[in-house]
Amino acid sequence: MSKLKTLNRQFISNLETHKVTTDAKRNLILSILKSTTTKREAKNYLTKYQNQFDFNDDLDFNKSIKIKNEQSSLTNRDSQRELFINRFLNQSNPFINVYDKEDVKLQKVPLRLAIFKIKFTKITIKQWKGIAETFKRLITLGISPIIMLDYDHLPSDSYKNNELYMINQGNKMLNYLGHPEEESDLKVTLLRSLFTSHKGVPTLDSLESILIPLYQGIIPIIQPIVYNADLSKQEFLASDKLLLGLSSALIEKRTTDLLSIEKIVMIDPIGGIPSIERHQTSHVFINLSQEYSDILSELFIGHIEPKYRDTHVDNLNTMNNVLSYINEKSGNDETTGIITTPEIMSINIDQLNPIIYNVLTDRAIISSSLPSTTNRTPHLSTTIIKKGVEVQIFDVDNYDKDLTMQNLFDDKLVNKEKLIDLLNDSFGKSLDVGPYLDRINKNIATVVIVGDYDGAAIITWEYSKGEKIAYLDKFAIAKKNQGLPGLADVIFKIILQSHPFELIWRSRKNNPVNKWYFERCCGCMSAPDSQWKIFYTGEVFDKKIDRFKRKLRHQNGVVDIDRKLQQYSEICEGITPSFK
């Protein structure tokens, strides 16, 4: 009887555990679906991070232990940890193929890393509590964080005093975030002297010193201390060199199947890179391949205090160096840079915390192509950065011949076949090539090509009542890239920057993209008997609109809206469809 009672209690206990586990999994999935705004984003996130979780019902009593173990063996992060750690303790290579002696070989589950460089100034206890919760949430979402401490603000003439300060701050961090020996949700360990410097170049001595804690679910905190082999002494290492050294060690030591660097995060009290266009609040998104040099120049004319300007320049340069290096070595643009403040990182709402939101969606909280002059566009202190894609822009300012489509084809600046293939793919229809090129050939205003024809835009000059108006004729993104974070924003920002005064475009009334267009225009209109919705924007609408046809309408600073709408309607309704 006692044995039966024991089995009964165990069965009830297993049911309760099963319920808790099932509820936790359900809540995780619901929170992911709630925080992602589209099905594509939710699918992309779950595809990338699915092996970081065990969504299998491993408490199914109808399965034998053997079957359960075979199904779960080494197919998710938790089930690989013990194997790797035991190998390391036995002084063997922890990361050789996990099925060396088996016929079936499974791909290793990579660690999804986020490297945090935290500037240790002006962070309140309340903010630390919020930051700790953010780290817990990131771990729940499948991210393995690494923390680097930034003490660049300290004077470099006294190692002893700085070391005492760093030890004190490190102990505070352990108290804020949790000790590895404690039974808490968050465990951290403090590491120092992981690097050796030779001729000014830091190298990581032991990659396992970082990876083993990560596989144990512990966040490693790295102190910026390096052993100088040339001078045989310990010294401090600048945070930018430490970040690049750590990133290169993780990428270079043949660990691409073991880990991926998903995020490079800088936590700095001054926040993201300031933008003149956004009235010194932060750039929302930076495509380094296209914008790096322009933004660097902008920082020196943006009326920023020199000490803050220099910090922003350092942050931008460091991000550019690290992301460029990772991009070159990995061959992809998966790594995202984030610069934000401690206050913002401490926010514990997925949709408002830009780090958590970026893990879920791989984009910024708001779109970078939203007009900064409208009240509905919030101002942020966070910048999202990608190495990004190369951009080619052709207009009268950078082309010394007559700007015609045929000339661009003849000079091999635009690949005709690739452009037509892109348009066909993007719109899902066949372009009526001959008539279309004949119509736009001599009316080209701007042509934008992104990447290897990953996206493109064609702007033409159209005429009405003796005036020429910029018309967005084609805005195309390859189907494989539709939904790719930032690509549409990159192209649309270039379009608006190329024609800031006045721009119009049309879209079919049933086009699901119309909501996206509406958020980026000054206004739109459509006739009841027309299939088109017409959008317009530009600085011309910063002027006063005269709706009552007063005599003032011909004065400078006033736009005759009736005349404008008639022009727009005449142009957009008069252009024949370009697809068969």
From Swiss-Prot:
Which Pfam families does this chain map to?
Answer: NAT
Induction entry: Up-regulated in cells treated with farnesol and grown at high cell density in N-acetyl-D-glucosamine medium. Expression is regulated by the general amino acid control response transcription factor GCN4.
Its Gene Ontology cellular component terms are: mitochondrial matrix
Q: Which residues form the N-acetyltransferase domain?
A: 403-560
A Gene Ontology molecular function term for this protein is: L-glutamate N-acetyltransferase activity
Query: Where found, per UniProt?
Result: Mitochondrion
Where primarily located?
Answer: mitochondrion
Q: What class of enzyme is it?
A: transferase
InterPro entries cross-referenced by the UniProt entry: GlcNAc_Synth_fun, Vertebrate-like_GNAT_dom
Give the protein's biological function.
Answer: N-acetylglutamate synthase involved in arginine biosynthesis.
Protein name as catalogued: Amino-acid acetyltransferase, mitochondrial
Source organism per entry reads Candida albicans (strain SC5314 / ATCC MYA-2876) (Yeast)
